[in-house]
Amino acid sequence: MDKTRAQEIISSPNMISVTYNGKEIYIENVNENTQTANIHLLNKPDKKQEVPLNNLVEH
C-alpha cells in the first residue's frame, strides 16, 4: 500500500478492510519518512506495532 492510500483510509469515515499478514488491522498513523504505519490488530487494540506500508493489503 502506498502512503497516500494509507492516509486516505485513516481519514475515511468508513471502516475499510486492511490486513497485515492475513489479519485485519486498524491503521493509527503513517510515518512518511520511514514508509511505515503504526497499526493494531482489530481484536487486540493494545498490541501496537510499526510495520512497512508495503505489507498492508486493502480488501
Curated annotation (Swiss-Prot):
GO cellular component, one term: endospore-forming forespore
GO BP term, pick one: sporulation resulting in formation of a cellular spore
Localization of this protein: Spore core
Main location: other
Keywords: Sporulation
The keyword Cell wall biogenesis/degradation is annotated on this UniProt entry: no
Keyword Zinc-finger listed: no
Similarity comment: Belongs to the SspH family.
Protein name, UniProt field: Small, acid-soluble spore protein H
Source species of the chain: Alkaliphilus metalliredigens (strain QYMF)
Gene: sspH
